[in-house]
Amino acid sequence: MTKAVIVSAARTPVGSFLGSFANLPAHELGAIVLKAVVERAGIDPSEVSETILGQVLTAAQGQNPARQAHIKVGLPRESAAWVINQVCGSGLRTVALAAQQVLLGDARIVVAGGQESMSLAPHAAYIAPGQKMGDMKMLDTMIKDGLWDAFNDYHMGTTAENVAGKWEISRAEQDQFAVASQNKAEAAQKAGKFADEIVPVTIKSRKGETVVDADEYIRHGATLEAMENVRPAFSKEGTVTAGNASGLNDGAAAVLVMTEDEAARRGLTPLARIASYATAGVDPQIMGTGPIPASRKALEKAGWSVGDLDLVEANEAFAAQAIAVNRDMGWDPSIVNVNGGAIAIGHPIGASGCRILNTLLFEMQRRDAKKGLATLCIGGGMGVALCLERP
């Protein structure tokens, strides 16, 4: 039976909150990577059957931002484009959906990925019913729609505190993990390891043009001493800080998916085959542990064991949850996030799933790795995972 394959991949640099991409809507970031994956695959844009993009923060962003990106870059008006919102897992779930589309014969070529501008998430107020007098509360849609647990009425950071308590993960462990992530990302950036996956973004302003070609959130020279001085963010006695958590970020990433037979017919060499994918649910209070059941399901579907994996990209929403995932999965930590993770690189929520997939794909190619896994935790208590294989 033919498999779904990824024939090209690309991502933008990850921008800091209110940083270089502060005024760039998500669909414009998305358009950049859509164009890049089509060009890198060497196919005619008119042959793209469908575009599927993850995006969490869509309030006031206009109708169907995936369609906006699709049309902006000149992909066919005759083919469809749509957004999914599975919170932090969106950008990876779209790739699983793309695989399903091509394997079922519902599409021949699908572009999948994610786009997000956390900087442009608006504040909003419910004024339609009218308010005769008194103050009016403005709602931060970034927090409400992206970072707030709807079931327990608290921030995602509190779920990380829950995991830290239940898994007995100390502040020291979290800080050490976070510094290691920063140091690995710094080393990777200096060595040019992200260059192949990144598409430079040109920012136009009254002062001229600026080209952004590197992730801007990575903190060079991060030390444990500095990390230890950051105050807890969600509880006075807590262990989760801004330093050992991922950031608020902007960015986009995409891959181009078709069947193995289609790639062979076109003479294209895939970056990897999609061996399996899975989602799973957990208690929303410990949402950060979602990758544990999701990864186990994906491995079982692929017929693999943890020991078969050569590389893992496990999103670092928080150091606490990342440590818990590593512990319970029992995989070799030396193969996990070898170039740093979201604590260092950043977490543009709807795009992160495809960002980690990009990083995994290019590192597998660099190391000639045969089996890899990408996984993320998801707000609301879920996880998503996808297994890749190379010949």
From Swiss-Prot:
Keywords, sorted A to Z: Acyltransferase, Cytoplasm, PHB biosynthesis, Transferase
BP terms from Gene Ontology: poly-hydroxybutyrate biosynthetic process
Compartment list: Cytoplasm
Source taxon at top rank: Bacteria
SUPFAM superfamilies, A to Z: Thiolase-like
GO CC list: cytoplasm
Active-site residues, record numbering mapped to chain: C88, H347, C377
Main localization, broad class: cytoplasm
Biochemical pathway: Metabolic intermediate biosynthesis; (R)-mevalonate biosynthesis; (R)-mevalonate from acetyl-CoA: step 1/3
An annotated Gene Ontology molecular function: acetyl-CoA C-acetyltransferase activity
Residues spanning the signal sequence: none
Enzyme Commission code(s) on record: 2.3.1.9
Known catalytic reactions: 2 acetyl-CoA = acetoacetyl-CoA + CoA
Subunit-structure text: Homotetramer.
Family statement drawn from the similarity comment of this UniProt entry: Belongs to the thiolase-like superfamily. Thiolase family.
NCBIfam families, A to Z: AcCoA-C-Actrans (TIGR01930)
Protein name: Acetyl-CoA acetyltransferase
Organism: Paracoccus denitrificans
